[in-house]
């Protein structure tokens, strides 16, 4: 019985909702008809006359107070709406309307939405996995001591956020530590040092780890697992301690390079020893994996030091050798460092060869790959490109390929052109980036802006064509053209990665909600009414009385604008304009 009553109520509610959704015009006319039929019992005309008399007795001070109060209230609503929109990206009034009024006016029921979500579970999960905002290590990240700290000393601003530095600490613990670190005293100290938040504490721990190795103590190391054969060896140098000092204590790139060379000597020895013992058990295999990460990191940073110090050809050779020696370690994205160095040498044929290997459909893309490919195609036509000539004769095949490459790059990361065209100011790139986000755009433009300027006409071609990308993807959050839809979570992640003094670029740009514009107009209009009422109380009082008479009297159809102004002239006793003699005759 109860179930039948509940079902009847649900059916009745659905019928009412349906009627409000599709038959609202019929309901509106029914209400008007009822008001017309009941106008005599309800004494509508008498009530309107009473209201009109009451309004006629009001003084101008009342209207000043009324308009001033309404202006103040609408201004407070505007301030609250603007704050809510800047913080949460949506209008509070619209959100409340959608959450509470939409179900009453025929919105989607929660059960039906859950059913639809469950039926499309596979597609939704695939889309979530694709659009998940994964943070990547910046392959071109700067040195903390020699570059980031110097910026802080000069400007007093912190270029790195706590979230970014915390991610770096997690990377260091992942790449530079293993479960057997407690067996070596220096590595045990460094394992704690990577967890330290205070930079001075980390540096002190690194010095302590190096001092332990200065003691010529001896340790017994098994030559073969589960064997009775032992060899006496000196404790090896701690490579990770040199890495920390080179990254955070060195104040110049030259000092960092010296420390990295010492780290290379220590890390190479550890790598060779662990390479011989890697098949003797899981513990040795973990040590070898850690020593491999340490060695690759040191060699990559040495190549970056050479690039910073102007030895670009030496840096290119070191990167090529590193990629040949460890071809499977793609997590460091060394090819992006190589592309930047080759562009500095203007070795465009070598750049094209690297792109042919890494710009593959099965490999993850980056702004470096997409925009470098666009730069190479733009280089072939940019020196002779003219928008006026192109509009007259049309685009040639080479120009069309260049424009398509630019559109492809802009679709992948739409934030880069503003930095390349210097429409937004650059800051130091963070240690981690979000692909397709503002952080990746900053990291790319910081190093590659000079390469675009070096190619004659490339920035002009980019300026003329990059905005055409948005016509092909009118709804980038729902459907892309060459890539997956643009992820929604980039703005939130970029705000965590980038410092607070930087204005984060948002795509697609959010438009102001209707209610913010409405409250702004309402506030301005009521403030203007309050000012006019205060300055001209008699005139505004006459207008208010005339308007109340128009809308409240039963004979409002006979009124027009002429009668309003005639009444204003009578109330204020404005004399008629003098007429000329010719007009009187």
Swiss-Prot record:
Annotated TM spans: 15-35, 62-82, 512-532
Record membrane topology: Multi-pass membrane protein
Name of the gene: ST7
Family statement drawn from the similarity comment of this UniProt entry: Belongs to the ST7 family.
Protein name: Suppressor of tumorigenicity 7 protein
Pfam families: ST7
Localization per record: Membrane
Keywords: Glycoprotein, Membrane, Phosphoprotein, Transmembrane, Transmembrane helix
Glycan-linked positions: 47
Major localization class: membrane
The keyword Nuclease is assigned to this record: no
A single GO cellular-component term on record: membrane
Highest rank taxon of the organism: Eukaryota
Modification Phosphoserine, positions: 386
Organism for this UniProt entry: Colobus guereza (Mantled guereza)
